[in-house]
Amino acid sequence: MTAFNVVRFRVKPGREQDFLDAHRKMNRDFAGVKAIKVIKSGDRSYCIIGEWSDMADIVTARPAMIGNLDAIREMLEDLGGGLGLTDPVSGPVVLDLK
């Protein structure tokens, strides 16, 4: 069943273009990935949204995705509230309302 992962970030002032450029160059060749989108959700706030064939593919790709995060970590600002630099969630689609 299709699954999604979403990761929320806040980029340090002056680093937004670096953040976007880094994502253009990142490894996205993950088994089972259908689409990866970057959305701007606010001032210096972004979300990465990935669509996957199933949850197992997300789990398998996590080490490589963490490697991608390591490449941009210094561009990110702490989200506060004990979250750290990212706010990730993932799960299977339970209702498809096309």
Residue ranges and their predicted role:
Residues 12-13, 56, 98:
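A short, structured loop/turn motif at beta-sheet edges
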Residues 25-38, 51-87:
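An amphipathic, aromatic/His-enriched active-site/gating alpha helix that lines ligand/cofactor pockets
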